């Protein structure tokens, strides 16, 4: 039996538009981002996907993307689970900074390492910074020491995988079709795990906003195939645009 999993990065956010490092900052979608959510729903509808359950983060750009896509699918009634483990990678002291200005200051190669390397985190956010997640009530029930002040993709994967094993994988094994709407780096982490991508290869992976990525899995959740829905060239161009965000102007 083929299991179906869709990974969907949220639509364009205001800080995507402003080319700023976002991380765990809870920013809203732009009008384009809301349109991308609807378009994603339309692509999934055209594919004939009937979901049984959906998962998202606790950040509204992902939540609102999921809501827009489900409305277009006429599947608003789906049970939705929200978890901090699906949040974007925490960008530490880079959060809020302009990516191009940061590249001009520190060099494009350094910014690429911070953005796309596997195990090198950006400079950490101080625990006394008001923006640190330990001061956010949505994380109040969590162990303060579990909340990051910065993350690499490696530590993001360590955060995401328990949710995969405890929540998502059992549903897929039970034959359910699952939609996960999250963020560029939490989805890169899942992509790396599912496709057994090397630490070096993951550096070049960029996930575009608002384009559903459909995985077909076997009974043991090994990947049989995966593809972006819609026009492959459009997905390629969108991924290239993501890659260019870390370049100096």
UniProtKB/Swiss-Prot annotation:
The active site is at residues 10, 88. The record marks 183 as: Transition state stabilizer. GO terms for molecular function: phosphoglycerate mutase activity. GO terms for biological process: gluconeogenesis; glycolytic process. Its EC number is 5.4.2.11. PROSITE patterns: PG_MUTASE. Disulfide bonds: none annotated. Keywords: Gluconeogenesis, Glycolysis, Isomerase. Pathway: Carbohydrate degradation; glycolysis; pyruvate from D-glyceraldehyde 3-phosphate: step 3/5. The keyword Isomerase applies. Substrate binds at residues 9-16, 22-23, 61, 88-91, 99, 115-116, 184-185. It catalyses: (2R)-2-phosphoglycerate = (2R)-3-phosphoglycerate. Homodimer. Catalyzes the interconversion of 2-phosphoglycerate and 3-phosphoglycerate. This is 2,3-bisphosphoglycerate-dependent phosphoglycerate mutase. It comes from Xanthomonas axonopodis pv. citri (strain 306). The lineage of its organism: Bacteria, Pseudomonadati, Pseudomonadota, Gammaproteobacteria, Lysobacterales. The gene is gpmA.
């Amino acid at each position: 039996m083929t299991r179906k999993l869709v990974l969907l990065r949220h639509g364009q956010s205001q800080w995507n538009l402003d080319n700023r490092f976002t991380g765990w900052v809870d920013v809203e979608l732009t009008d384009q981002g809301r349109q991308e959510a609807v378009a994603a729903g339309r692509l999934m509808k055209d594919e004939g996907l009937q979901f049984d359950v959906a998962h998202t983060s606790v950040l509204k750009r992902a939540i609102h993307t999921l809501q827009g896509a489900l409305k277009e699918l006429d599947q608003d009634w789906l049970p939705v689970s929200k978890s901090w483990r699906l949040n974007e990678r925490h960008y530490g002291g880079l959060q809020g900074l302009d990516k191009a200005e940061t590249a001009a200051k520190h060099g494009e190669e350094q910014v690429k390492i911070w953005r796309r390397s596997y195990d090198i985190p950006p400079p950490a956010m101080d625990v006394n910074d008001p923006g640190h997640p330990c001061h956010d009530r949505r994380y109040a029930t969590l162990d303060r020491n579990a909340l990051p002040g910065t993350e690499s993709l490696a530590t993001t994967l360590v955060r995401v995988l328990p949710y995969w094993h405890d929540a998502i994988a059992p549903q897929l094994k039970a034959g359910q079709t699952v939609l996960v709407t999250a963020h560029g780096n939490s989805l890169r982490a899942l992509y790396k795990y599912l496709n057994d991508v090397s630490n070096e290869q993951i550096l070049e992976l960029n996930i575009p906003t608002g384009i559903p990525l459909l995985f077909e899995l076997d009974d043991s959740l090994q990947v049989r195939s995966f593809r972006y829905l819609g026009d492959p060239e459009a997905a390629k161009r969108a991924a290239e645009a993501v890659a260019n965000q870390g370049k100096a102007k």
